[in-house]
Structures are given as structure tokens and as C-alpha cells.
Amino acid sequence: MFGFQRIGDQIWAAADQRPRGFLPGATSGRTTLGGEGLQHQDGSSHLHAATIPNCMAYDPAFAGEMAVIVDRGIRDMMIEQKDVFYYVTLMNENYAQPTLPEGVDEDIIRGCYLYKQFTVQQPRACVTLLGSGAILTEVIQAAERLAAQQIEVTVYSVTSWSEIARDGRACEEALLNEAPEPGIPFIYQQLGKSKGPIIAATDYVRALPESVRAYLPADRRYMTLGTDGFGRSDTRAALRAFFGVNAETIVKAALLALK
């Protein structure tokens, strides 16, 4: 239940033996299990998971995303007979589970899909918000507040930072090897549907969203928010305010990036 930060070496040893299966991370993020303090709150597991080549790591925010990921995992491991295993972080927070947009299943597996566009009449600016797992609800609240200020917002749910980064690296390697069709990073393509500076917020250390910086459009400012440091014992709201990953801080970051 304490994530890769406690048992990472055992998972690495297992990876060498080509395991298959689902490994649920039952304390997703550093602010989700509010009273456990610095010992048990997990802010780095997805960084550890990204270092293991046959580990598919996901941080879903909604039950619909989870269903898509589990379905693909079963197909990969049982039908396609791939020697991979899935690390999926879970939450224990109660909030509404929306219906997923049509046609996003493959985007969920690849790591990022367009969740919603908050359009306004005669917007005075545009901004893009990326959120994952426990913090996506804070991102959505921030988008609503920004839209109330006549700022148009595009929200993406990032289901896997590590899969996005791996895709970007594969495109870079193809370029280095002079492949005839090296491809365009998936996250670069996805963000083509949005405008303005990009703000990313997660319940993990900032190094996680920073891992995709190289594959974003170079002409757009990118700011990351995360939970660097030790965990603390407090309520979810207080923890998210302390680490600066709550809706209020996301709004402030977006307004700062627009200056």
C-alpha cells in the first residue's frame, strides 16, 4: 500500500523475471491519504515506475479511465501474451464520476486525452491545464474559476506521464537513427488542439510532469505544480494548499503564466 518508494527494488527484481499482472498502488499521491504523515504518503512512485521498461504505469482520475486501462491490460497480458505488468495508482476520495468523451480509449492508453474545453464568449486569453489522478478534480475546479474570468481553458487528463515520455523518447531515437518517418510526439499532437501557456498539476513530485517538457511545443510556456518534500498529517484541503496543487494555486499559476 505504500507504493514503489518502499518496495521498488523488489519490483525491479520481479521485472527481470518477466511478470504479468496488475499492481494497484493503494495510496495514490501525497495528499490523498490525509492523516498518514511523511512515512506513508507517496509522491514518487510514478518516477520509480518509469525506470522499469516492462512496467506500464497509470494514474487514472476516473472509474471510466480505470476500466479502459484494465481492459487493455488484460488484452495485452492474456491475449497478446506480452511480458508486461501494470502499475495503477488508486484513490479513496469520493467525487462524481463523469461519462468519458467518445473515442478517447486509445488516448487514455497512450497517456493523455482531451477531457473538456471551457469555452467563453470573447475570451480575453487562453490557457491549457494538464492534471492527473487525485489532482484532476482540482484542475477542473480551477478551469471553472478561470472561465468565470473570461479565460478560455482546455483541460487534459493525463493518465500516464511515463507513457507520454516514452513515446517522446522513441520519436527522438527515431530522429537520431535517421528513420524515414520518425513521428511526432503524441503529447505534441494532443496539445495542438489547445492554445496558451500550459500548467501541469499532479499529486507527485514536480519531476514527474517535468519528464515530458522536451516534447511540448517550444513556443508555449510550461509550468509544473507538484508535491515535493516530505508528506504531512492534515486534511486533503490543507495538504493541497500547503503543497500548492489546489484549485486556487492552479488559478494563480495560470494567471502568472499569462502575464
Question: Which residues fall in each region the model found?
Answer:
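Thiamine diphosphate
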Residues: T32-H40, A57, E65-I69, I74-K259
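A generic local secondary-structure boundary/capping motif
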Residues: I11-A13, H46, I74-M78
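Active-site nucleophile and cofactor-binding loops and adjacent substrate-binding regions
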Residues: M1-G3, A26-S28, L38-Q39, Y58-A63
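A glycine-rich helix N-cap at a beta->alpha junction
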Residues: A14-G29
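Alpha-helix C-terminal capping segments
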Residues: A13-R18, A50-I52, A147, V212-Y215
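Long, structured ligand/cofactor-binding scaffold of large enzymes
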Residues: M1-D16
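Short, glycine/polar-rich helix-capping loops at beta-to-alpha or helix-loop-helix junctions
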Residues: H40-L47
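Short glycine-/polar-rich loops that comprise or flank the Walker A/P-loop
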Residues: R18-G21, N54-C55, G196
